């Protein structure tokens, strides 16, 4: 009963010290008041502490009763620095409480709890010790469920102690929990000699509990920080996942685009193939694989005006078809036009249609047309455009119905030559056309002619070497390019400017553009001849642009 009376006295004295809460803003006055109250009420505190220690820590009481005087001496030696620590902790707690007053509502509850706790430290530090132990024990479950820990503390301790210690445990920060641990150490120092036996055990338990509490708080804070860190980490993970998904989508879209791109080149290649097919189909009618008879695309055109131009020819044949090329024969001496040439069309059908224009007037002259041998025919020989005395109507003359004739009397007029040739070859078959090239400079025949038969060409070729009378022997052959013609043969006059045989004249067999050797004075040395020598055939071939051999001048020139 005595203990209960002392307990009631403690409650009355605590009420007397409550007004000290208002003057708590002056830390120095509070410290002096605390010291005086502690000295006067050592007995009461000792009784209360023993009662609570017996109830709550029986094992520790037994160990403290058995402790010797050495622990008491050690405890006395530790009292002075502990008091200093308590005063400093009180000052710091006061400052923190005064600083925390304008804080948010969450911090207000914590500051109120610390004020109540400090007032209780002034009145009964032993009560704080026991309550500190409870706080230290209950801090770990408080991190999981704070409201449950508050109720447990109220049941285990007195109302005053629970109000002072449970409120800081309700929503504590790490800074509030640490001063509570320091207050518990200061309350241990204020106890009397009777309670000193218990303190070695309780002090060891209290700092450990405080450390555990601080560690639990720090672990809670760490866990909170980790949870907060985990949130941005989750956000980052979410963003990464979204980025990954977006990257996957982008990769899929890129793959789709790549597939589309792969499909488009295929389409392009097919388009190219279609275009090529269209081109080839467009070209097929222009180049038939089986050309018609006389399927050359080139026409020989003679009796042309000397003032003619390419545009005149294109306009003349525009009704027949497309004119691809026009080649006029020119004189190699001065480059003057010789009055004939070749016209190439886009197709053989167009050339055949243009052949119907034979005899029509072109710039005041009736044009004479004939089919010329196409390029590449007869052993890949090109179409022949005559440039000299070896001129043959129709160019290469590869048509099956044409023959080449020379060796006749070239001094005759064009009409006389035609009539003579018609009479000579009349027995072979029907003659469709006779062409006698004329030198426009002199107006004389070039000594050659072309005959076209409807039929009977083979019989006409049999007349090669036949005598036309007057000592003229004909040379009859297939139409050939100039390079394949040979000089010599016969006893023609041979002294003409364009003599083509091997006669005995001054320039026999050579002439200005002669192609064969002979006995002439300058045999084989014509102005554009490429060979020489008595009786030599080295002069064959088309005349070269660069004169070769010895240049001779004559007095009559």
From Swiss-Prot:
Residues 485-503 have a biased composition (Gly residues). It is found in: Nucleus, Nucleolus. Residues 64-74, 91-101, 124-135, 186-197, 218-229, 249-263 have a biased composition (Acidic residues). PROSITE patterns: RRM. Residues 297-374, 401-481 form the RRM domain. Expressed in roots, leaves, shoots and flowers. Induction: By glucose and sucrose (at protein level). Keywords: DNA-binding, Nucleus, Repeat, Repressor, RNA-binding, rRNA processing, Stress response. Disruption phenotype: Reduced growth, bushy plants with stunted leaves, abnormal vascular patterns and many stems. Plants exhibit a pointed narrow shape of leaves, but no filamentous leaves. Plants with double mutations in this protein and in AS2 or AS1 protein show severe defects in leaf shape and filamentous leaves are efficiently formed, although a few normally shaped leaves and markedly narrow leaves are also generated. Altered nucleolus ultrastructure. One of its GO terms (biological process) is leaf vascular tissue pattern formation. Pfam families: RRM_1. Involved in pre-rRNA processing and ribosome assembly. Is associated with intranucleolar chromatin and pre-ribosomal particles and plays a role in controlling activation and repression of a specific subset of rRNA genes located in distinctive nucleolar organizer regions. Binds specifically rDNA chromatin and may be required to maintain rDNA chromatin structure, but is probably not required for the overall histone methylation status of 45S rRNA genes. Interacts with THAL in the nucleus. This is Nucleolin 1. It comes from Arabidopsis thaliana (Mouse-ear cress). The gene is NUCL1.
């Amino acid at each position: 009963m005595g203990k209960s009376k002392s307990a009631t006295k403690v409650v009355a004295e605590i009420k007397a010290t409550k007004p000290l809460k208002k003057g708590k803003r002056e830390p120095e006055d509070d410290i002096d008041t605390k010291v005086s109250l502690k000295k006067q009420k050592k007995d009461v505190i000792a009784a209360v502490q023993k009662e609570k220690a017996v109830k709550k820590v029986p094992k520790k009481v037994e160990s403290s009763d058995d402790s010797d005087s050495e622990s008491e001496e050690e405890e006395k030696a530790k009292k002075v620095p502990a008091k200093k620590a308590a005063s400093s902790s009180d000052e710091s707690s006061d400052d923190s409480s005064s600083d925390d007053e304008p804080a948010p509502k969450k911090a207000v509850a914590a500051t109120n709890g610390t004020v109540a706790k400090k007032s209780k430290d002034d009145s009964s530090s032993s009560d704080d010790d026991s309550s500190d132990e409870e706080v230290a024990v209950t801090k770990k479950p408080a991190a999981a469920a704070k409201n449950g820990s508050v109720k447990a503390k109220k049941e285990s301790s007195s109302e005053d102690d629970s109000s002072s210690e449970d409120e800081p445990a309700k929503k504590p920060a790490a800074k509030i929990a640490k001063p509570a641990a320091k207050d518990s150490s200061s309350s241990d120092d204020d106890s009397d000699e009777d309670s000193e036996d218990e303190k070695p055990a309780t002090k060891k338990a209290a700092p450990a509990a405080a450390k555990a509490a601080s560690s639990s708080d720090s672990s809670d804070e760490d866990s909170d920080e980790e949870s907060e860190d985990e949130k941005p980490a989750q956000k980052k993970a979410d963003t990464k996942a979204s980025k990954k998904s977006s990257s996957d989508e982008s990769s899929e879209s890129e793959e789709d685009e790549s597939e589309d791109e792969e499909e488009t080149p295929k389409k392009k290649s097919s388009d190219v193939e279609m275009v090529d097919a269209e081109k080839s189909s467009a070209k097929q009618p222009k180049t038939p694989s089986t050309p018609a008879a006389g399927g050359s695309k080139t026409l020989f055109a003679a009796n042309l005006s000397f003032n003619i131009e390419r545009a005149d020819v294109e306009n003349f044949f525009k009704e027949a078809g497309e004119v691809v090329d026009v080649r006029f024969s020119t004189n190699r001496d001065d480059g003057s036009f010789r009055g004939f040439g070749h016209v190439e069309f886009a197709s053989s059908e167009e050339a055949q249609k243009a052949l119907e224009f034979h005899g029509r007037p072109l710039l005041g002259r009736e044009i004479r047309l004939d089919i010329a041998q196409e390029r590449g025919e007869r052993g890949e020989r090109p179409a022949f455009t005559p440039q000299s005395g070896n001129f043959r109507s129709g160019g290469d003359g590869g048509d099956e119905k044409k023959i080449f004739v020379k060796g006749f009397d070239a001094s005759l007029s064009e009409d006389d030559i035609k009539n003579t040739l018609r009479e000579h070859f009349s027995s072979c078959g029907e003659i469709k056309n006779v062409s006698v090239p004329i030198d426009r400079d002199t107006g004389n025949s070039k000594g050659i002619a072309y005959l076209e038969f409807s039929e009977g060409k083979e019989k006409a070729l049999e007349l090669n070497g036949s005598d036309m009378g007057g000592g003229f022997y004909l040379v009859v052959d297939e139409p050939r390019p100039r390079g394949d013609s040979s000089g010599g043969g016969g006893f023609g006059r041979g002294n003409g400017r364009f003599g083509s045989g091997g006669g005995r004249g001054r320039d026999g067999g050579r002439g200005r553009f002669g192609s064969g050797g002979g006995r002439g004075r300058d045999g084989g040395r014509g102005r554009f001849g490429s060979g020489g020598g008595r009786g030599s055939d080295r002069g064959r071939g088309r005349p070269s642009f660069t004169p070769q051999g010895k240049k001779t001048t004559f007095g009559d020139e």
